[in-house]
Amino acid sequence: IDIDTWGVDFGLIDRNGNLLGNPVCYRDPRTDGLPEEFFGDNLVRHYSEAGIQVMSINTLFQLYSMKKSGDTQLEVADRLLFMPDLFSYFLTGVANNEYCIASTSELLDARSRTWNQPLIHRLGVPAHLFGDIVMPGTVRGKLKREIAEEIGLTDEVDVIAVGSHDTASAVYAIPSTQVDKSRCAFLSSGTWSLLGVELDEPILTEEACRAGFTNEGGVGGKIRFLQNITGLWILQ
């Protein structure tokens, strides 16, 4: 079993494994104007570390909004789990963060593929919220016995981390038997249209920042260098 979802949204669980509140959709206006407030004129410097297009919907600014409003969930939370991490946790009881989905948060260091601890410290949220990062292909755990019995499956079913951001899995699934992916661009269309290329390393230049490109994590440690374009959201 594997799970992928949209990016940036998350849930918080406490030390007993309880979900502290329903996740809030990234379309919520609570983050409006927060990127400018948080970074001021330092966007280019931040981009040189995170490599992610600065957008108010990103996890960074959702957490900043919670911090500013004094949301008590942050005081009792033990782990932050992005949506596919959260669903996998419900199935296995194992809490970790998959790399591709974590990269959408704007809280990773694009070069090291690890949490940006100085940024997390500046944000003012507990560092322990951010758990181990696992790569696609990692077995997260076994399906819980009670769930397996309920649906008639053996309890030896693996729950596996895929490219848990749906675009990461879509790009990885591009047929490549006859094609050199390094010479191809991709266009993945849904709520958003994502136009880009797959690279071995991020592009963290000022030009890339000002042009609105983002460096999201891909399967196999790749980088999806792309632009977010309006997709089917209006129709949806």
Model segments located where?
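Glycine-rich beta-strand-to-loop/alpha-helix junction loops that act as flexible
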Residues: 1-6, 136-137, 189-192
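Active-site phosphate-binding/coordination module
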Residues: 2-60
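Glycine-rich phosphate-binding loop of actin/hexokinase-like ATP-binding domains
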Residues: 10-36, 77, 81-116, 157-236
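Generic N-terminal helix/loop capping motif
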Residues: 38-41, 136, 150, 174
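Gly/Ser/Thr-rich active-site cleft segment
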Residues: 46-167
